[in-house]
Amino acid sequence: MTTMMGRVNSAESFTVALRSFAPDVVLSDTTLAQLDSFAALEILRAVRPTAPFIIVTGAPTGAQTVAAIRAGAENLILRAYLSGLVSSISDALAIRRPLHSLTERQLQVLKLVVEGYRTRDIADRLGVSVKTVESHRGQVMKRLRVHDVVHLVRYAIRVGLIPSTF
């Protein structure tokens, strides 16, 4: 495993860094003036939807914590407790590891399934046959070790592919 650290100060430089370096995990400090963590998380989900996002913060309110988790952050780590950062990163990567084994097409099918599209609609949207969509969905479920669409959606919420509405 290669470790790389970088610092960005704008949405543009963050997007370039994501595309150039394809990080396995992103840490965001809430004190960044020009790029807040929620904007960074939104960019991350568009560019690298499977990468875990962990926010480092001073003293979040309950509402900020709930908003971060709903937006798809894996965790919020208090600066006073940075000793938990390594285990938080390890946990986030372990949960998402099966997701990294999916092909780009399987990831597309997964997103459309959990967004509620029917098989026929997914096939039309992707320009493939219904059988191809069923095959991709079956492979996704096998790799993620889920047995039905309900558990597929729960997994997608847990890893931040879709926001949780509690």
Model segments located where?
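Short amphipathic alpha-helix used as the core "switch/output" element in two-component signaling
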Residues: 38-50
